[in-house]
Design a protein with these regions (language model features):
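Substrate-binding/active-site clefts of carbohydrate-active enzymes
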Residues: 48, 52-116, 123-248, 269-275, ...
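Active-site-proximal helices and loops of the catalytic beta/alpha 8
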Residues: 151-163, 171-172, 177-188, 241-243, ...
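Carbohydrate-binding surface patches
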Residues: 468-499
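Hydrophobic faces of well-ordered beta-strands that scaffold small-molecule active sites
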Residues: 47-49, 118-120, 164-166, 253, ...
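The feature marks proteins involved in alpha-glucan
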Residues: 1-48, 58-75, 81-83
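Conserved, mostly hydrophobic/aromatic
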Residues: 51, 110, 120, 137, ...
Length: 499
């Protein structure tokens, strides 16, 4: 009898050199994408900066328009955590008054830092400070300013070589919204109020009015019916949300919880934004390898050229944090990055949003020394700071992570204040105010110089990538051009990007 041997994907299923098997092996992934797919150059060549608008800079002392909002008079005090009785989540009703004009005033700082793309967390009218509970998609939250302020911000930013991306929250709204209107705070007949509401079909009611589908079971965030034609027209029509704010000056959308949006919704949205602007981008919040993600039983074709231009590169971020924390050997870092490189179309891989920090996790400085205080109740995490030794170690590792991100394909993304040394546990304490006048100047200088180097070396945005490791603690990144004229990389003993 003959004996069959098979050759297939490596046993960790990360591609590269395969393995022999006696039984049918795991297959390699083959990604077939639209050959015309080509995200705009400003993604590939960009350096991004994420801003949580309430916490970056305020141009004036705010005035509360609602009685349920708490305004901080002291800019530098920590955010509050007050639990919602229904969900246990933070109420998020304390505000510091950061605004769009405040961001505009700091454009010179951002330009000097090397930033070319601003990603703003939600700016539309909402109840909370994070504004992921949209109240009115067509109106800027009054605490942030108005449409004229947004237009002025985009115009001035573009004059300084900076584009603006908005956060699109199209999976759910707030219960306190023009569309749901649970509390009657808006001048509309909301879906909660009546089955005769023009917005009733936008939601999934099991039994009207109190039994309805909500995002992850959080009752303050009623889930939208993305299949509803009137809702789709509202978002994607000629005068819809997506195109309206592109007309006002935005260059694209970061899509919150992209996995919650049906694939045909994303395809239609892509067509809509391209009707408005051919270089408008869609960037998705996806936490895993976006080339083979399955959500709600459906394969997500994020990377094939018909939906997204880019995603948030959480897999890379997680791998680098573990590596710098001595929890993952360099060999595994190389395996993980090569797997993404192998699975993603080249235009997609070079346009990834390589985030450092995030509004959804503890501050990067904390994570790099495992000081996220997750073992403590939320109320006890407020205002905690690391001791001098841990802070120095965190800063050292942070600078190394900036160096690594800087040398890899994709656009680095700095979460506001990380370059200034900000600390903080998870939400809401990772959303503190920018420490103007109290920044870590040496870290700021390091980041500024790193980004200057990236912008001055085209090989770092367009060059080929080779990875190697020497032992468990040394990762070597080599970037080179096809003709060999522009090479980035040095011997191990003095390489600035060798860790």
């Amino acid at each position: 009898r003959g004996h069959w041997m098979y050759y297939g994907n490596a046993r960790d299923k990360l591609g590269g050199i395969g393995a022999h098997y006696q039984d049918p092996p795991p297959a390699y992934q083959i990604t077939v994408y639209d050959p015309a797919f080509n995200p705009p150059d400003f993604l590939r060549e960009g350096i991004m900066y994420q801003i949580f608008p309430d916490r970056f800079h305020r141009s004036k002392m705010p005035v509360a328009e609602r009685r349920d909002r708490v305004l901080h008079s002291e800019w530098n005090e920590p955010p509050y955590f007050i639990a919602d009785d229904r969900s246990g989540d933070n109420w998020a009703l304390d505000f510091f008054g950061g605004d769009l004009e405040g961001i505009r005033q700091k454009l010179p700082y951002l330009k000097d830092l090397g930033i070319t793309i601003l990603y703003l967390n939600p700016i539309f009218q909402a109840r909370t400070n994070h504004r992921y509970d949209t109240g009115d998609y067509m109106k800027i939250d009054p605490l942030l300013g108005n449409e004229e302020d947004f237009i002025r911000l985009c115009e001035d930013a573009r004059q300084q070589g900076i584009r603006v991306l908005l956060d699109g929250v199209f999976s759910h709204t707030g219960e306190d919204s023009l569309y749901f209107n649970r509390y009657g705070n808006y001048p509309s007949l909301g879906a909660y109020q009546s089955k005769e509401s023009p917005f009733y079909s936008w939601y999934h009611f099991r039994k009207h009015p109190d039994n309805y589908a909500s995002w992850w079971g959080i009752p303050t965030l009623p889930e939208l019916n993305k299949a509803d034609s009137s809702y789709r027209h509202f978002i994607m029509g000629p005068a819809g949300v997506a195109r309206r704010w592109l007309k006002a000056g935005a260059s694209g959308w970061r899509l919150d919880v992209a996995d919650e949006l049906p694939m045909d919704f994303l395809r239609e949205l892509r067509k809509a934004v391209h009707r408005e602007s051919k270089d408008a981008v869609l960037l998705g919040e996806v936490w895993e390898d976006a080339s083979n993600k399955i959500a709600y039983g459906q394969m997500r074709s994020y990377v094939l050229g018909d939906t997204l231009d880019s995603v948030m590169n959480y897999p890379l971020r997680d791998v680098l944090i573990r590596f710098l924390s001595h929890e993952l050997p360099a060999q595994q870092v190389v395996r993980q990055i090569r797997s993404l490189q192998e699975n993603y179309p080249l235009p997609f891989f070079y346009s990834l949003m390589n985030l450092l920090g995030s509004h959804d996790r503890a501050r990067l400085h904390n994570l790099l020394v495992r000081q996220d205080y997750a073992h403590l109740p939320n109320a006890q995490r407020r205002g905690l700071e690391m001791d001098k030794h841990l802070k120095e170690l965190a800063t050292e590792r942070f600078c190394k992570m900036v160096s690594l991100i800087n040398a890899l394909p994709g656009m680095p993304c700095m979460y506001y204040g990380d370059e200034a040394g900000m600390e903080g546990a998870a939400d809401p304490f990772c959303r503190g105010t920018f420490p103007w006048g109290k920044e870590d100047r040496s870290t700021q200088d390091f980041v500024r110089e790193a980004f200057r180097l990236r912008k001055s070396r085209p090989v770092l945005t367009r060059g080929f990538l080779e990875l190697a490791c020497e032992g468990e603690d040394t990762l070597v990144i080599h970037r080179y051009s096809k003709d060999g004229k522009d090479v980035f990389g040095q011997p191990l003993d003095d390489a600035p990007y060798t860790l």
